[in-house]
Amino acid sequence: MNNAEWANKDYYADLGVSKNASAEDIKKAYRKLARENHPDKNPGDKVAEDRFKKAAEAYDVVGDETKRREYDDLKKLLASGGIRGGFGSGGADFPGGFRSTQGFDASDLFGGAGPGGGFSADGGLGDIFGGIFNRGSSPRQSARPTRGADVETDITLEFREAAKGTTIPVELTGEAPCNTCHGSGSASGQPSKCGQCNGSGFTSENKGAFGFSAPCTNCGGTGEVITDPCVDCRGRGTVRRTRSITVRIPAGVEDGQKVRLAGQGEAGPNGKPAGDLFVRVHVKEDPVFEREGNNIHVTVPVSFSELALGGAISVPTLDKPVKLKLAPGTPDGRTLRVRGRGVETRTAKGDLMVTVQVTVPPTLSDEAAEALRTYAEAEKKSGFDPRANWAGNNR
């Protein structure tokens, strides 16, 4: 669709709502129309298909807060006579007493208005037309990159490395500053001022009664040109090579998290700043520890006697093992907290959560078996019944 045709649309009427309708009413109206006229519900019905498309187009504009505001501003401008003669040839009046008396086609304000940049008429028309219709400059007139490209890479860490933090070498292949010209692109090391824009980076163009500015096509908006290109980089200021950098991974990084290193991406052209490096971290599973937030969980096998009689057990941590005291009668599956032994970040420190789990010996020595039989008799005499309060007794 031609951009100028968009301005002649009545999107509110297409949705069957008033211009003052709330966002919720607009959404409800669109959903109702979309449901009633959906192609799947009306196979072969061209009228329903057209209604469906019109509703979708309308909702795309007035269903978006920013686009709706720009659309409303444009319609108000047209209704007030701010642009007369419609979107064909003829004169045009603009707010602020500014008038075009020459043969002016208002459609020039849209896609064919000339290269991007600021529209000089009062009233913010550049914002209105440029925003809703996405008018922009052509590729050949757009400014050159002002920084290097961002780079992404992946690394894999052990569980402890991610929890405690580490440094790791990373090898990257991409654009790096040319060593011969030190990134300037010029053999002399000093680019020259662009003669076409006089170093400003922009040129002006008059279209009828209106003035437009655009990035200079000679220097790409930089204000500088290379008159003596470096033989090694051919004036780009960068060459492709492999480099190795050391990446510091902060403590507490999680699986899938990205670490940003500013200025460590690809070098910018002709001395422009480098892009950023984003390192995506993958964390291996650990056979002992599991992480939940900043807390670390570990399950420790224990014997029945250790739980029944109490005592101290050795528990692994991210650093070195610690002793954990068990009270007599600690139940199987109990989770105990060791404070401050979890993952430590810049803002918080987690705990170590220790779950004790009874392990039954697969075989017993004669001495151990006799001791257990003696214990079993004593247990009965003491009146202990592990199923005394069990709900299953009533089934």
Swiss-Prot record:
Is Cell inner membrane included in the keywords of this UniProt record? no
Q: Which Gene3D superfamilies match?
A: DnaJ domain (1.10.287.110), Heat shock protein DnaJ, cysteine-rich domain (2.10.230.10), Urease metallochaperone UreE, N-terminal domain (2.60.260.20)
Which UniProt key words apply to this protein? Chaperone, Cytoplasm, DNA replication, Metal-binding, Repeat, Stress response, Zinc, Zinc-finger
Which part of the chain is the J domain?
10-75
User: Which free-text remark accompanies the cofactor?
Assistant: Binds 2 Zn(2+) ions per monomer.
**Sections of the chain in a coiled coil:** none
Q: Which of this chain's residues are annotated to bind Zn(2+) 1?
A: 178, 181, 230, 233
Zinc finger (CR-type) positions are 165-242
Query: Which Gene Ontology MF annotations are present?
Result: ATP binding; heat shock protein binding; unfolded protein binding; zinc ion binding
The record, for HAMAP family, names: DnaJ
The entry assigns this protein to a family as follows: Belongs to the DnaJ family.
Q: What is this protein called?
A: Chaperone protein DnaJ 2
- The organism named in the record is Corynebacterium efficiens (strain DSM 44549 / YS-314 / AJ 12310 / JCM 11189 / NBRC 100395)
